From Swiss-Prot:
Subunit structure: Binds DNA as a dimer and can form stable heterodimers with CEBPA and CEBPB. Interacts with ZNF638; this interaction increases transcriptional activation.
Cross-link (Glycyl lysine isopeptide (Lys-Gly) (interchain with G-Cter in SUMO2)): K3
Record GO cellular component, one term: nucleoplasm
Taxonomic lineage: Eukaryota, Metazoa, Chordata, Craniata, Vertebrata
Protein localization: Nucleus
Gene3D superfamilies hit by this protein: 1.20.5.170
InterPro entries, A to Z: bZIP (IPR004827), bZIP_sf (IPR046347), C/EBP (IPR031106)
Protein name: CCAAT/enhancer-binding protein gamma
Biased composition (Basic and acidic residues): 56-72
Domain spans labelled bZIP: 62-125
Gene that encodes it: CEBPG
Keyword terms, alphabetized: Activator, DNA-binding, Isopeptide bond, Nucleus, Transcription, Transcription regulation, Ubl conjugation
Amino acid sequence: MSKISQQNSTPGVNGISVIHTQAHASGLQQVPQLVPAGPGGGGKAVAPSKQSKKSSPMDRNSDEYRQRRERNNMAVKKSRLKSKQKAQDTLQRVNQLKEENERLEAKIKLLTKELSVLKDLFLEHAHNLADNVQSISTENTTADGDNAGQ
């Protein structure tokens, strides 16, 4: 049987306990968890990386704001150009495939005609061959009948 015991650390910044120690039969294991402090759960659990950030509105006249806006505008422009290029590439590929499809359809028509001509030639030849075989067998049977009478 596995015996489990837990030990909670004391609440840290903003009432958050960050590390729980769990004792298993296999040994101790530290598991990072975010747990609100206090029985009432009055505050939200906040990740440590988010605790130091404060969302204060940025001054629109500051250099940092202007730099961020400029970087964002360049990123948007780059994204739109990339999207436009992708659309043009797709359109070009569609046109290439249409041309190839037309070429292949023409080839199918040509090969179908060729097949039809060859099929007709084959059937005509087979019919002539059958007529020749039949006439030869008729000649042989009449010749055999003539030879039998001699």
